[in-house]
Each structure stands twice: as C-alpha cells, then as structure tokens.
C-alpha cells in the first residue's frame, strides 16, 4: 500500500511525516480494511497514546471497514470504553459487521457518517470443524458472542434486543440516513465538524 508523506514547516525547519502519523497529531485514527489482531493492536496503541497525550480531548476514529474478527473488534471496543477521552466515530465509505458495531460504540452524540456511507449489521459468522463435541463447543461460543453483540447494539441504538436479533439474522444494509434513524449514528455529516 502506498502511504503518502507530508512536509510540515515550522520555525525549527521542515519535518516529514507519513500521513497517518500527521493525522494522529490531530487525534485522528484511521480504521481501514478488515479488522484483525494486528490492526486492532495498532488501533488500541493509538487510543492509549492519545489518552496519555491528553485525557480531556476527543479522539476521532474514522472507519472504512467490511468487518472482521470479533475478538479483535472487542479489543478496540473495550479500549474505547476504558480510556477517558470520548471517541467520536465517523463512517467513511462503509462500516459493515464489526465495523458497524464499532461505529455504534462511539461516544453518545458523537457518532457520524458521511452521506454516501453504507452501514451493515448481521449476526456473527463462523465455521467449525472437527469432532461433534468440538463443533458443539464452537456453536455455543458463537451464540454467546451473538448475544453479547446484540445486547450492546440494543444499548447503543436504543432498540429492543428482539428487534436487533431479528434484523441481524441476515445482512441488514442501511444508508447513512437510515443508520441515523435506526440509532447506529447520531448525525449524517455534510461538512467537517472540526
């Protein structure tokens, strides 16, 4: 992946940054692509760093993700709740599956999407192989995770758990405006809010 560099001029001279490091200076984190352990570790580290820099200033988490590994997403979610700063979530492009879950987990009143964003929720995906007992163990675990996800989504959207369970039985796609009406986000952004 090509990563652009920017030059910043100051009284002490010029300094070169990769674009993500430059955005981090403005408390912006980019969550882009499939969510897996390596990406989650990077997001968690950035959240913790920004909290250490200033625990009173908001952090802006931009999301463009098709989803990914549940436990990786939970590590980001738990860190968002663990740190003191509010985490504002902004969907750019798409927030599907775990991406949509994390979008909904931003600070209340600070969950956004750009007008042409696509948001999708569904039940956890999984597969199991092995002996019947192993498959049964995996099935119980995925049902447990489904319950946790549905409970958190219900809390975040102020929908009933039964509605979340019904809507996530299959892929449930929404426009930015529909996601606002559903309660996944608080506002559709036409212009930058910073």
Curated annotation (Swiss-Prot):
Its EC number is 3.4.21.92. InterPro entries: ClpP (IPR001907), ClpP/crotonase-like_dom_sf (IPR029045), ClpP/TepA (IPR023562), ClpP_His_AS (IPR033135), ClpP_Ser_AS (IPR018215). It is an enzyme of class 3 (hydrolase). Its main location: cytoplasm. Keywords: Cytoplasm, Hydrolase, Protease, Serine protease. Pfam families: CLP_protease (PF00574). SUPFAM superfamilies: ClpP/crotonase. Cleaves peptides in various proteins in a process that requires ATP hydrolysis. Has a chymotrypsin-like activity. Plays a major role in the degradation of misfolded proteins. PANTHER family: ATP-DEPENDENT CLP PROTEASE PROTEOLYTIC SUBUNIT (PTHR10381:SF70). HAMAP family: ClpP. This is ATP-dependent Clp protease proteolytic subunit. It comes from Campylobacter jejuni subsp. jejuni serotype O:2 (strain ATCC 700819 / NCTC 11168).
């Amino acid at each position: 992946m090509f990563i652009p560099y920017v030059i910043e001029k100051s009284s002490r001279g010029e300094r070169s940054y990769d674009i993500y490091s430059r955005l981090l200076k403005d408390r912006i984190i980019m969550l882009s692509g499939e969510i897996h352990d390596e990406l989650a570790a990077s997001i968690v580290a950035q959240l913790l760093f920004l909290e250490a820099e200033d625990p009173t200033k908001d952090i802006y988490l931009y999301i463009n993700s098709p989803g990914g590994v549940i436990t990786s997403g939970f590590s980001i979610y738990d860190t968002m709740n663990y740190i003191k700063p509010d985490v504002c979530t902004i969907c750019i492009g798409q927030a599907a599956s775990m991406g949509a879950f994390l979008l909904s987990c931003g600070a209340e009143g600070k969950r956004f999407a750009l007008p042409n964003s696509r948001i999708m929720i569904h039940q956890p995906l999984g597969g199991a192989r092995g002996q019947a007992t192993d498959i049964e163990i995996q099935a119980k675990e995925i049902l447990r995770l489904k319950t946790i996800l549905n409970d958190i989504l219900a809390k975040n959207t102020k929908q009933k758990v039964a509605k979340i369970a019904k809507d996530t039985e299959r892929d449930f796609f929404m426009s930015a405006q529909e996601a606002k009406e559903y309660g996944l986000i608080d506002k559709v952004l036409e212009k930058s809010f910073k």
